[in-house]
From Swiss-Prot:
HAMAP family linked to this entry: DHQ_synthase
Designated name of the protein: 3-dehydroquinate synthase
Compartments, as annotated in UniProt: Cytoplasm
Swiss-Prot/TrEMBL GO biological process terms: amino acid biosynthetic process; aromatic amino acid family biosynthetic process; chorismate biosynthetic process
Biological source species: Pseudoalteromonas atlantica (strain T6c / ATCC BAA-1087)
C-alpha cells in the first residue's frame, strides 16, 4: 500500500492507495467516529461497489443516497436532493458522509458536507482515474451553474481518501482516457521526469498494468498534496493545477455538460495552452509536439469542437473563476515541467489561437 499525507496542520489527512482496498473496512472504520454513516453514490457505481463498502463496515449503520450518473447532475437540484435525504434520515453534524464515485459524486458530496449544519465529516472513495488523481484530493467542492462550471462551492477537506485501483477495471475506456488527461497535466506543470516516464509507459497504462497504475496515481497525488500544502486556497501555486481548464470549461459549457467529458475538454485545453506558450516564445515546437503526441496516444482530443471560435470561447471565459481585476488569467507552460499563471495573452494572440 502507498500512504501519503496532505499536510494542513490539524486538518491533515491520509491518502491510501492499493488494489482491493474497498474490502478492508477496518481502515475505513477508523475515520468514522459514530455508528452511523451515509453513502452517497450514483446509479452506475451503486450496483458495482456500494455493497462491498457496506459489508466491510459491519459495526456501522450505513444509509444510502443514489443520484443519477453524469456531469449534468452536478447541480443545485442534486445538492438539494441530498440535503433533503439527509434531513429525512435525521443525519446529524457528526454523521460521516462517504463519497463513492467519480468527480461529480466527490464534488457534490463534499459541498453537501461543507454546508449541512455548517460542516460534517466526509470521506472520499474515488472510483474513476480522474477523481483518484485529482478531484478527490485537496478539498475543492462544488456544483455547476448554467453560466459556469464549479461556480457554487467551498474549500472543505475530507477526513481521508481511499483509492482502490481495482475500481478502474470497471471504468469505460473513454473515462479512463479522460482521467489520463489530468495525469499528463501533472507532468506538464510540475515534473518533466514524470512526463518522460508517461511517454515510456503508454502501453502499460492503457493495459492498466497494476504497478504502472499504482506509480502514476501515487505520483499525481504526491504532487497535488505538495501543492495543496503550500497553497490550499489557490492564491498562487495551486492555480497551476488548472492547466487546460480555462479553455476546457468553456468547451464543456458550450457543448453542454456531459457531452464532452471533463478530461477530454481539459486535453484540448492543454494543447491550446501549449500552443499559446509557443506563440509567446516560451515553449519549443518540439515540446508542444511531445504534449500533443502524448495526449493523442490516449485517444484524447487535441483540438476544440470545430464550431467554437474566439467569440464563443470569450463569452464563456468571461465567467471563469480565474478572472481577477477584470483580467483573465491563463495557465501556460513555458516548458515541460514548468508553467506560469499569466494574463498576458492578448486579443491578437487569442484570435490567432482560437479562430
Amino acid at each position: 500500500m502507498t500512504t501519503l499525507t496532505v499536510k494542513l496542520g490539524e486538518r491533515s489527512y491520509p491518502i491510501f492507495i492499493q488494489p482491493s482496498l474497498l474490502t478492508q473496512g477496518n481502515q475505513l472504520a477508523d475515520y468514522i467516529k459514530t455508528d452511523k454513516a451515509v453513502l452517497v453514490t450514483n446509479d452506475l457505481v451503486d450496483p458495482l461497489y456500494s455493497q462491498t463498502v457496506i459489508d466491510s463496515l459491519p459495526s456501522i449503520k450505513i444509509e444510502k443516497i443514489v443520484i443519477a450518473d453524469g456531469e449534468q447532475h452536478k447541480n443545485l437540484a442534486s445538492f438539494e436532493h441530498v440535503i433533503t435525504q439527509l434531513l429525512s434520515m435525521s443525519a446529524a453534524r457528526d454523521t460521516t458522509l462517504i463519497a463513492l464515485g467519480g468527480g461529480v459524486i466527490g464534488d457534490l458530496t463534499g459541498f453537501v458536507a461543507a454546508s449541512f449544519q455548517r460542516g460534517m465529516p466526509f470521506i472520499q472513495i474515488p472510483t474513476t482515474l480522474l477523481s483518484q488523481v485529482d478531484s478527490s484530493v485537496g478539498g475543492k467542492t462544488a456544483v455547476n451553474h448554467p453560466l459556469g462550471k464549479n461556480m457554487i462551492g467551498a474549500f472543505y477537506q475530507p477526513k481521508a481518501v481511499f483509492i482502490d485501483t481495482k475500481t478502474l477495471q470497471t471504468l469505460p475506456a473513454k473515462e479512463f482516457s479522460a482521467g489520463m488527461a489530468e495525469v499528463i497535466k501533472y507532468g506538464i506543470i510540475y515534473d518533466k521526469a514524470f512526463f518522460a516516464w508517461l511517454e515510456q509507459n503508454i502501453a502499460q497504462l492503457i493495459a492498466q498494468d497494476v504497478d504502472a497504475l499504482q506509480y502514476s496515481i501515487a505520483r499525481c497525488c504526491e504532487i497535488k498534496a505538495e501543492i495543496v500544502a503550500i497553497d490550499e486556497r489557490e492564491s498562487g501555486l495551486r492555480a497551476l493545477l488548472n492547466l487546460g481548464h480555462t479553455f476546457g470549461h468553456a468547451i464543456e459549457a458550450e457543448q453542454g455538460y456531459g457531452n464532452w467529458l471533463h478530461g477530454e475538454a481539459v486535453a484540448a485545453g492543454m494543447v491550446l495552452a501549449a500552443k499559446a506558450g509557443q506563440m509567446k516564445g516560451w515553449m519549443s515546437k518540439e515540446e508542444v509536439q511531445r504534449v500533443i503526441a502524448l495526449i493523442e496516444a490516449f485517444s484524447l482530443p487535441i483540438a476544440p469542437p470545430a464550431n467554437m471560435g474566439y467569440q464563443t470561447f470569450m463569452q464563456h471565459m468571461a465567467h471563469d473563476k480565474k478572472v481577477q481585476a477584470g483580467k483573465l488569467n491563463f495557465i501556460v507552460p513555458k516548458a515541460i515541467g514548468d508553467a506560469v499563471v499569466t494574463s498576458e495573452l492578448d486579443e491578437t494572440l487569442l484570435r490567432s489561437l482560437l479562430d
